[in-house]
A protein has these predicted regions:
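Outer membrane beta-barrel transmembrane domains
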Residues: 1-17, 22-28, 38-158
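Outer-membrane beta-barrel "beta-signal"
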Residues: 82, 136, 161-174
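Mobile, glycine-rich extracellular loop/lid and propeptide segments
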Residues: 34-36
Length: 174
């Protein structure tokens, strides 16, 4: 309650309630015993049912989508290792608008003067992410991994250009 698409609930940008419909189509196919191809597409339709007295109000229906295509492999260097290479677009609002409540001054009686402006909620950028992962089961209780990503327009922000990330993972069980 009080948030859209996993954002923080409450506050000036929160909503009182919303209804979201979601679908996902995904597929997986083995090329051989060591290599597989995968793909997924998700679509989202959200109707904000209540958002009064907020900075954003009077929402249209919001649509969003995400997609992914990739390859997964096992037994690359050793029997107990695996890797994946994917290209994806994280969830992105593709259409929708809302009225923005803009304060612009104080009246003689101390009241805040405001006007409403209709704004589009779809970002101007479109993140595309290229990700590479590698993991190896080192022992019964230890797994090691590495993750690398190149993100273009991260967060669907066209000003961010190309970003890279690298992480290592050590996972143990006791």
């Amino acid at each position: 309650e009080g948030s859209l698409y996993g954002s923080a609930p409450g506050g000036a940008l929160g909503v009182a309630s919303a209804e979201t419909r979601y679908f996902r189509i995904s597929g997986y196919g083995r090329i051989n015993n060591y290599l597989a191809v995968l793909a997924a597409f998700s679509g989202v339709l959200t109707s904000v049912t209540e958002a009064e007295d907020r900075l954003l109000d009077d929402f249209s229906d919001l649509t969003a989508q995400s997609w992914l295509v990739g390859l997964g492999a096992k037994g690359i260097f050793l029997k107990k290792d695996g890797a994946s290479l994917t290209v994806s677009q994280p969830l992105k609002v593709t259409d929708g608008s809302a009225s923005l409540d803009v304060p612009h001054g104080l009246g003689a009686d101390g009241r805040v003067l405001r006007y409403q402006e209709r704004i589009g909620l779809a970002p101007s950028g479109s993140e595309t992410s290229l990700e590479l992962t590698y993991r190896i089961k080192w022992s019964k209780s230890l797994e090691l991994g590495a993750y690398g990503a190149m993100r273009y327009e991260a967060g669907h922000n066209p000003q961010l250009g190309l970003r890279s990330e690298l992480a290592t993972v050590v996972r143990g069980t006791f």
